[in-house]
C-alpha cells in the first residue's frame, strides 16, 4: 500500500496563521489494518483512511498560536481564533472564538468599531 497526500485547506487570502497551529484534514484512523501474509515477503493489505474532510478558512481571518483546527471545520471571514483553541464545525463570519472546545465570545465588527472610535479620538 502507499500513502498519498490527502489534504485540502481552502482560503480566500489575507489569512494569518500563527506559530504551532495544527490543521487536520483527516483523522488517519483505520477501518482495517494489515490482514494477512500469503507467502514470504508478500502481504495482502486492506488499509483505508476512515475520514477525510477539508478545512475552509475565510478571508482576513487570524488563527492564534497553538490552535487546533479539526477536520471538516469551516471558519468564516474576518474571524479571530484565540491561541490554543480547539475548533470544530462551522464558525460564522466575524466570530471571535476561544477555548477547548471553542466558543464564540464576541464579534470582530464590534471590535473594529471600537478601534475606529479610539483612533479618531487620538
Tell me the role of every PLM-derived stretch.
Residues 115-122:
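Acidic/histidine-enriched, glycine/proline-rich intrinsically disordered or flexible terminal extensions
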Residues 62, 80, 96-97:
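Short-chain dehydrogenase/reductase
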Residues 16, 83-86, 96:
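Hydrophobic alpha-helical segments of small multi-pass membrane proteins
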Residues 1-74, 100-101, 107-109, 114:
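Flexible, glycine/small-residue-enriched loop-and-beta-strand segment within the central core
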Residues 65-80, 85-89:
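Beta-rich strand-turn-strand
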Amino acid at each position: 500500500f502507499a500513502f498519498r497526500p490527502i489534504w485540502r485547506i481552502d482560503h480566500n487570502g489575507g489569512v494569518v496563521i500563527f506559530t504551532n497551529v495544527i490543521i487536520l484534514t483527516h483523522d488517519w484512523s483505520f477501518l482495517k489494518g494489515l490482514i494477512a501474509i500469503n507467502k514470504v515477503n508478500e502481504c495482502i493489505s486492506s488499509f483505508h483512511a476512515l475520514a477525510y474532510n477539508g478545512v475552509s478558512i475565510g478571508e482576513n481571518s487570524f488563527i492564534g498560536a497553538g490552535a487546533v483546527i479539526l477536520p471538516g471545520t469551516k471558519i468564516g471571514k474576518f474571524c479571530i481564533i484565540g491561541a490554543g483553541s480547539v475548533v470544530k464545525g462551522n464558525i460564522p463570519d466575524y466570530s471571535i472564538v476561544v477555548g477547548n472546545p471553542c466558543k464564540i465570545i464576541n464579534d470582530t465588527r464590534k471590535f473594529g468599531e471600537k478601534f475606529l472610535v479610539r483612533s479618531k479620538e487620538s
